[in-house]
Regions:
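Sec-dependent bacterial lipoprotein signal peptides
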Residues: 1-12
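N-terminal targeting sequences that direct proteins away from the cytosol to non-cytosolic compartments
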Residues: 10-87, 134-136, 143-145, 160-165, ...
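Short N-terminal helix-initiation segments at or just after the protein's N-terminus
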Residues: 16-33, 95-99, 113-126, 144-150
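Short amphipathic beta-strand/extended segments with alternating polar/hydrophobic composition
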Residues: 46-49, 92-95, 169-170
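A short acidic-to-branched-hydrophobic micro-motif
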Residues: 73-115, 182
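Short hydrophobic-acidic sequence motifs that mark active-site Asp/Glu residues
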Residues: 90-92, 151-153, 178-180
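Residue-level recognition of well-ordered beta-strand positions that form the cores
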Residues: 94, 155-157, 184
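Signature of long, low-cysteine stretches enriched in small and polar/charged residues
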Residues: 106, 110-173
Length: 210
């Protein structure tokens, strides 16, 4: 997806802080039961409002919103897509193992989250054309997610073809996983996707094995 390609996989020399893990794309992402998702590939749960839909397959409409259709052979695979069929507002969840040497702190998470906005204006115009207007970049903020040690959020708002949009990204870490959450809100009169999005994020939880 245009400028919001969260590639925060990095490494540094030194003593390993965790065993080497790999992305198990052969394992099913998880189980959808009504409006509840329970992860199998990675240990997280999330629920959506009744009028939203969830799928582990890439929704076709997201190509028009700037997302690239993933290749089945990609080493990184998004575990869950959730969206409002009426407005096409959506939120997508991905987890991936952290590298053996990667170390995390809240300060570092916030710094990496903020760094994504470096070329955001030019990237938006390249992806959407010159019709993009009123681009505003929001602050980098810590965010509390259940079962997550460190997390930060940032967003950008803009207008395209008379419609206001918000695109945001959340980057988090809970040993031994990195967490990537991308969302898009397409505003429509009479629909409160922003409130729905908050409920979805409030329901998200990384389950710690006991």
């Amino acid at each position: 997806m245009m400028m919001i390609v969260l590639v925060f996989l990095f490494g540094c020399a030194g003593v390993p802080v965790r065993p080497a893990l790999k992305e198990e794309i052969g394992v099913p992402p998880g189980k959808i039961d009504g409006n509840q998702f329970t992860g199998i590939r990675y240990p997280f749960e999330v629920s959506v409002p009744p009028h939203w839909k969830m799928t582990t397959e890439f929704p076709d409409f997201m190509v028009e919103l700037g997302y690239e259709r993933p290749d089945p052979t990609d080493k990184e695979q998004t575990e869950l897509y959730a969206y409002n069929p009426e407005t096409k507002s959506n939120i997508n969840f991905d987890m991936t193992p952290a590298g053996r040497h990667d170390r995390f702190s809240q300060k570092m998470i916030e710094s990496l989250t903020a760094s994504v906005t470096g070329n955001i204006k030019s990237d938006l115009e390249k992806e959407r054309g010159k019709g993009v207007a009123n681009i505003e970049i929001g602050p980098t903020e810590p965010i509390s997610l259940k079962g997550v040690q460190y997390a930060a959020k940032k967003h950008v708002t803009y207008t395209l073809k008379g419609q206001k949009r918000e695109q945001g990204w959340i980057y988090g870490f809970m040993e031994p996983y990195q967490i990537f959450i991308l969302y898009t809100i397409l505003e429509k009169e009479g629909v409160n996707d922003r409130q729905d999005m908050k409920k979805i994020l409030d329901s998200f939880e990384v389950i710690t094995k006991k």
